[in-house]
Amino acid sequence: MKALFLGGLVACGAPEPEPVDPAIELGTGDIDFEPLADGGDVYVIHGPQGGYHVLASLRVVGIETGNPDDPADAINPTMTFSVEHSGVDITLTGQYHQGLDPIVPEGGDWSHQTVGRLCILDIPDDDVLAGEPIHFAVEIADTNGVVLTDTRDLIAVPHPLN
């Protein structure tokens, strides 16, 4: 009788989670995700190799998030960060093909994230953007064909340690 009962539990399994609508949020931060609000400031950072970048982060729910332990895994999504100034794309590089990390502890509106990616800018000096409005954007495409985008209109501020 015990074997029959245990077999019934295994056959039933856990209920499937309810599907959620795919969503994305663009943010910043180098260790933890930091949300951005339209009209807010974002730091332009002078990197160790002489260039300038904005720290780019995102969090998502409802998409294939890939394998965060294997950057070469074909199931990983592709994310593209970009910055426009005066209608011109000033992004030198900002594309990543990698798995997203689960958000721990679980709960809230988001399931996975990536934090602190570099959106490298094609600018000669941070003075070019000091106090200027920029359009910061992200697009993520998963292997199931789901594409999500988010944008923020921000004010560029040179990092105080530049």
List the predicted regions and their residue ranges.
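Short, compositionally biased P/S/T/A/G/V-rich stretches that sit at domain boundaries
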Residues: 17-54, 159-162
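C-terminal motif of bacterial Sec signal peptides marking the signal peptidase cleavage site
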Residues: 10-11
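Sec-dependent signal peptide recognition
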Residues: 1-7
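Contiguous beta-strand segments within globular domains
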Residues: 41-78
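Short, solvent-exposed, Trp/other aromatic-anchored flexible loops in extracytoplasmic proteins
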Residues: 94-134
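Extended low-complexity, serine/threonine- and proline-enriched intrinsically disordered segments
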Residues: 70-96
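Short beta-strand elements
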Residues: 146-162
